[in-house]
Every structure is written in C-alpha cells, then in structure tokens.
Amino acid sequence: MAEVKVPELAESITEGTIAEWLKNVGDNVDKGEAILELETDKVNVEVVSEEAGVLSEQLAEEGDTVEVGQAVAVVGEGQVNTSNDSSNESSQKDEAKEKETPKQSNPNSSESENTQDNSQQRINATPSARRHARKNGVDLSEVSGKGNDVLRKDDVENSQKSSSQTAKSESKSQNSGSKQTNNNPSKPVIREKMSRRKKTAAKKLLEVSNQTAMLTTFNEVDMTNVMDLRKRKKEQFIKDHDGTKLGFMSFFTKAAVAALKKYPEVNAEIDGDDMITKQFYDIGIAVSTDDGLLVPFVRDCDKKNFAEIEQEIANLAVKARDKKLGLDDMVNGSFTITNGGIFGSMMSTPIINGNQAAILGMHSIITRPIAVDKDTIENRPMMYIALSYDHRIIDGKEAVGFLKTIKELIENPEDLLLES
C-alpha cells in the first residue's frame, strides 16, 4: 500500500482544492499516472501516483482543500475488494425495502429496483456522484454528463434541478454552475462560489493596493513606423520562422528590456528593508482565459530574438487557455506587460503584479489628428501607454524616462532592432 500525497508545488503555494478526481476507487493506476487535478492559487496541477497498482481509497472529495504533504489517496497492490461496500449497500437497500408499504414491495417493483441498482453499478461515476445519487434517489442511467465518460456530483445535482425547473432555467444553471436565489422574484440574482483562483487574485490585488505606493504615468506612441515595418516584413517573417506571426507584443517586449536596462529601478522589488534589483529579464505577458487573467513569463527576453519571443508568447497563450500552464511558467518574473487594447481599452491604470515594481499597459490603436510639426496636422495611428509603478522604489523622473524610452524605440523600430 502506498499513500499519494500532495507534492511540493512552489514556495508560495501551501494548499490547493481538489478540482476533479481522474481515477475512481478500483481503477488501475500506472506509476507516474495522474489520479486527480488540483486547483492552486496560480494553476491547475495533476497529482500523480508514485506506485503502480489499484486505487483503493480516496481520502478527500472534490472541492476539499488539501495541504502540501497531505495524503489524498491510497494505491494498493492487486484488485480492490469492494465486497464490503457492495454488501453494505445491499443490506441498506434490504432494510429500506422491509420498511416499505405492501404496494411498494410487490415482486415486479423489487425486480425493477434490482435492475436499476445493477445498472447504476455499471455506469462510470465518481464516488461522490454515487453517494449523492443514492442519498437523493437519482437514477444514474438518466443523468447526462458534460461530454466526458465519468459522471460527477455536479452532473447529478444538475439532473435534480432539471426535474423541477423549466428548460430555460435548467440551461442557465448548467452553464453558470450557480444557484439562483428568488427571495424577491421581481429582482432575481445569481449567487455562486468564487473559484479558488479568483479569490486569490482578489486577495493579491487588494494587498498590492494596500501595501504599495502605486502611481501611474502616461505617454502616447505614434505607431506609424512600427506598423509600416510589420506590414513590410510580416510575410517574410512567417516564411522564415515556420508560420510564426510578427505581432506588436514582441516589439514592446524588446523595448521594455532596453528600458529596464536603462532604468534598473523598474526591475526591482522590496524585500523587508532591502531592495532587490534583478539582473534578468523575465517578462510576464497577461493572457485572458475563462478562469480570468493569467500572467505566464517569457524567460530571458534579453537573449531571445523577435521570433523566439513571438513563439513563446503563442505557446504560453495556448497552454493558458488549455489549462496546461505549469508553476514554472507562472513564478519569479521581473516585469509585466498587459494589453487592454485587445478588448478595446483606450486607457487604463493597470495594477502591479505580485512583488514587481511596475507594469506596462498597452491600449487600442486609434487613428486621430496629430500635430506632426508646427504647421502640419496628420491623422496618425496612436496608442496610449501607461506605467503603473511603486513610488517607494521608483521616482517620477525614472518612471517618465522609462515610458519615454518605450515611446522612442517603438516610434523608431530600426533603433529597437539595433538594441536587440
């Protein structure tokens, strides 16, 4: 017998929530095979068995919070003996039948119940789903899942709701996973549990707001030259780099690296009474997912070319949306860039990420009239950029200079190529 324990994840992560059991009691388990998915403050991770055998016991249920080092399952040798559970179920059913009225205990009804019990045993469902179904008298054969092979507790709960609600409210409940409260039917509301990650994000954002002297400075960038360069080079870039597209994010990433080298205070953090200035350039790129905004890091951007940065950004975005990010993708960055422009934002004051000193905000490119010299006004594609920074570390002079460096490099992309 071997216990499966929650592994060490990251220095800042001490616990997680069991999001989903991937194996049921009685399933064969290979060495190194994942048996459950754990939701942490940063990413979802799979917990694997270090031994081959049969999953003989689940020590926690879906939704339970478990700590690092805590045993969550037992993997044994050979086949699991489920006769005790089966006999207990059988005896409970027999006791229930003895208490039923004569009308309910006719042979045909009993035969029907036995058939239903056998049918439920053949259906692939999690232990929590079976317990909930037995407790509430739900026939698992009438429960439809969410597109996978295993019925789960929420599938059973949704099936219960569907029997008492209209088709419209059923669809709404299944899509949102929430519970509607109707104390005042004319003012309906929906109450739902926040996910662990959203609760953590809310806590961290509040901590940043309360524990830093955050200030934001703005500038504007004429995107004419970089857009022209991208237009001229994008087809050749795709051919030269196996289909990788040239976007604006790589330009801003390289510009940020150059500005960080010029203004190292922006690449720092406070640790107690010390200020730590980072000598590396791991740039976080904010990615929007169904679970909210995630910030994986592109490592060593000072050593990567434009194509390598674009490829890594694309790979991290796919991993984020497929919930495949690892903890190594999410920790120990030095600076973050967020692009609210993809959602149509014209201007914003982004919030600093974690222990970093600053964050760069990109926004929508909007064509508007600009005075290009004393006597000439032209329509130019313009972008507002913002730098939110911790005023305890960074003075206004450095913040303005940093943003001005970004502006100059983007407006003169040939200089940016030379910087690289």
From Swiss-Prot:
One Gene Ontology CC term in the entry: cytosol
Protein name in the entry: Dihydrolipoyllysine-residue succinyltransferase component of 2-oxoglutarate dehydrogenase complex
CDD domains: lipoyl_domain
Gene Ontology biological process terms from the UniProt entry: L-lysine catabolic process to acetyl-CoA via saccharopine; tricarboxylic acid cycle
Catalytically driven reaction(s): N(6)-[(R)-dihydrolipoyl]-L-lysyl-[protein] + succinyl-CoA = N(6)-[(R)-S(8)-succinyldihydrolipoyl]-L-lysyl-[protein] + CoA
E.C. number(s) listed in UniProt: 2.3.1.61
Gene3D superfamilies associated with the record: 2.40.50.100, Chloramphenicol acetyltransferase-like domain (3.30.559.10), E3-binding domain (4.10.320.10)
Modified residues (N6-lipoyllysine): K42
Location of the active site: H391, D395
Record's compositionally biased regions (Low complexity): 159-174
Keywords: Acyltransferase, Lipoyl, Transferase, Tricarboxylic acid cycle
InterPro entries xref list: 2-oxoA_DH_lipoyl-BS (IPR003016), 2-oxoacid_dehydrogenase (IPR050537), 2-oxoacid_DH_actylTfrase (IPR001078), Biotin_lipoyl (IPR000089), CAT-like_dom_sf (IPR023213), E3-bd_dom_sf (IPR036625), PSBD (IPR004167), Single_hybrid_motif (IPR011053)
PROSITE patterns documented for this protein: BIOTINYL_LIPOYL, LIPOYL, PSBD
Annotated Basic and acidic residues bias: 91-102, 149-158
Family named by the database record: Belongs to the 2-oxoacid dehydrogenase family.
